[in-house]
UniProtKB/Swiss-Prot annotation:
Spans annotated as Disordered: 148-178
Organism: Arabidopsis thaliana
Annotated CDD domains: ASKHA_NBD_Arp8-like
Protein name (record): Actin-related protein 9
UniProt-listed InterPro entries: Actin, ATPase_NBD
Gene assigned in the entry: ARP9
Similarity comment: Belongs to the actin family. ARP8 subfamily.
């Protein structure tokens, strides 16, 4: 995508006046790849496409060591403490009072016969189709073609090495002289989530809770290698862009608000250095979401799988002091759904373990999307739950699920969602020595260690933009974010321009619940009496990707783009143009957007 010459300004203006939007998409989006990273999924596609490929952000690697865990996050702490259990029951009762259903202890003692219940069978056509689908275990083998002369001509050492690497004692029964069955070295996407725990694979999630999943058991180098492998596989298998062709492609990287400077730099190195793109630009999800829905000013509420964020955007510029990061998302709603069913003894006596068997999380996510909604009154349905035992076909169990309107209320009562606690990353991961010009060396890092603080609380990112999670509900986060925006006229506009994006934003009844809860959360001293959630013009889970595509296509100046050779040689340096002469921050160089 060549940069226009300085004397072609008028021709560009004439071009924009006459060209059709579809023509701009096809002409400028054909060699522009948009990459939107998330904790659970990564969305990748050409800017001219209607939708991206939505692929689970994980990789399963073949392992030879016996006794090694099948999931790298095996060390996650999911034990609920006594205090957390008390807080969870209290949060349940608060939600029950709002939904006009029986409290937790009342429900368990009085039974379900006397309840006034509503029944659901899937609230939309897509959910009705998905609710009865069954997952199958991934075939971890592949055929290895062998020449008929290979037994006599191949050296014994070479044959032994290849056999010990990934070839099990499984042969093709049809023609053993021409092919063998061997383990696949790497498996990506949903296939990786459906590998049986008995198979010799370890599952890696390079991004967790909105950050690189760096821990003593998962090095930063391996995280970057896995991200590179996942993106490379998508580019090759889904978009069919070879390594040689990528020198003529450009990338728009849409990153979560949770990413810090070092993670952004690592992504630029992966995209430009390892994936061979010609140039790249970085935009944050909040800004991309505004453009994805064709607005300029809005409060963006992004409810992801593991993290939710709130940020306000005014006239195409994100307001850093309005940013809120909440450590829960759609997967926590799934786990809450499982807890409630087990509490009421509605869940079959099967081994459902969302950590050891990610396939169980896929099943719970289907149940959540099909049946969970926010509405008053008892809500039950008959559903088919499947048990997935190691290597065995799925076994169906019909059961009566109850209190299906409570799990999504965890967005407003976060104590209802007890999130996993992740291992602490190494201390040196937080310290980016290339940011000395930001005076971070002169800031208090909290003394020695974390002093028992949460994972990201003690990390000083920059004086104006701390990356700190807040343990408040969604309504309080939205209200606090907008009230931090400043002018009263801007606040009124933002309260009337709330956008819900992300997969969990599809929950039926969530829009009305957000409007009601936010209105009640506004202090009486504020002269604001209107709260409105705007309908999304694009599928909520793809809004940020679509916005990244629009930003990339409309950026005719391309002054904010970083070229491959420039990044590999110079790395982070202040821009040479006037707009960047005082900018030492990576955000100022890589995230700057120029209106055409």
């Amino acid at each position: 995508m060549a940069k226009p010459k300085s004397n072609s300004h008028l021709s560009w203006q004439d071009y924009l006046k006459t060209v059709a939007p579809t023509q701009i998409l096809s002409e400028r989006g054909a060699n522009l790849v948009v990459i939107n990273l998330g904790s659970a999924n990564v969305r990748v596609g050409l800017a001219m496409d209607e939708k991206p490929f939505n692929v689970p952000n994980c990789i399963a690697r073949y392992i030879t060591q016996s006794g090694k865990p099948t999931v790298v996050d095996q060390m996650l702490n999911t034990e609920v403490t006594t205090n957390q259990h008390v807080d969870r029951e209290r949060a349940y009762n608060s939600a029950a009072s709002l939904l006009k259903i029986l409290f937790l202890d009342e429900s368990s003692s009085s039974g379900s016969a006397s309840r006034k219940m509503g029944r659901i069978d899937g609230y939309n056509q897509a959910s009705t189709i998905k609710k009865d689908s069954v997952f199958t275990w991934t075939d971890v083998y592949e055929d290895e073609k062998i020449s008929l002369a290979s037994p006599a001509e191949t050296s014994p050492d070479k044959g032994d090495a290849s056999a010990s690497e990934a070839v099990p004692d499984v042969t093709d029964s049809k023609d053993t002289s021409e092919s063998k069955r061997k383990y696949r070295k790497m498996i990506f996407g949903e296939e990786a989530l459906k590998i049986s725990p008995k198979e010799p694979y370890c599952l890696y999630h390079p991004i967790r809770r909105g950050h690189f999943n760096v821990s003593p058991h998962y090095s930063a180098q391996r995280v970057c290698e896995d991200l590179t492998a996942i993106l490379d596989w998508i580019l090759l298998e889904k978009l069919h862009i070879t390594h040689k062709e990528r020198f003529s492609f450009h990338a728009v990287i849409v990153v979560p608000e949770t990413f810090d400077t070092r993670e952004i730099k690592e992504m630029l190195t992966i995209v430009l250095g390892e994936l061979y793109f010609n140039s790249a630009v970085v935009h944050q999800e909040g800004l991309s979401a505004v453009f994805g829905n064709g607005l300029t000013t809005a409060c963006i509420v992004n409810i992801g799988a593991q993290t939710s964020t709130v940020v306000c955007v005014e006239d195409g510029v994100s307001l850093p002091n309005t940013e809120k990061i909440l450590p829960f998302g759609g997967e926590d709603i799934c786990r809450c759904l499982l807890w409630i069913q087990r509490h009421y003894q509605k869940w079959p006596q099967i081994n459902t373990d969302v950590l050891a068997k990610p396939i169980d999380m896929l099943m719970l996510n289907q149940l959540k999307e099909s049946f969970c909604e926010i509405r008053a009154g008892e809500l039950e349905t008959v559903a088919t739950v499947h048990s997935y035992e190691e290597g065995m076909p799925a076994v169906p169990h019909k059961t009566n699920l109850t209190s299906l309107n409570v799990p999504p209320m965890g967005l407003f009562y976060p104590n209802l969602l007890v999130p996993e606690i992740f291992p602490q990353p190494p201390r040196q991961w937080f310290q980016d020595y290339e940011n000395m010009l930001e005076d971070t060396w002169n800031m208090d890092f909290g003394g020695g260690g974390n002093m028992g603080l949460p994972m990201w609380d003690s990390f000083a990112f920059s004086p104006s933009k701390p990356k700190k999670e807040e343990k408040i509900g969604l309504a309080e986060a939205i209200t606090s974010s907008i009230l931090s925006a400043g002018r009263i006229d801007l606040r009124r506009k933002l309260f009337s321009s709330i956008q819900l994006i992300g997969g969990a934003g599809l929950t039926k009844g969530l829009v009305a619940a957000v409007e009601e809860r936010v209105l009640h959360a506004i202090p009486p001293t504020e002269a604001i009496d209107t709260v409105q959630v705007l309908p999304s013009r694009t599928e909520p889970q793809f809004v940020t990707w679509k916005g990244g595509a629009i930003l990339g296509i409309l950026d005719f100046g391309r002054e904010a783009w970083i070229e491959r050779h420039q990044w590999m040689v110079n790395g982070v340096n202040k821009g040479g143009l006037k707009k960047y002469k005082d900018s030492y921050h990576l955000q100022g160089q890589a995230m700057y957007f120029i209106n055409p």
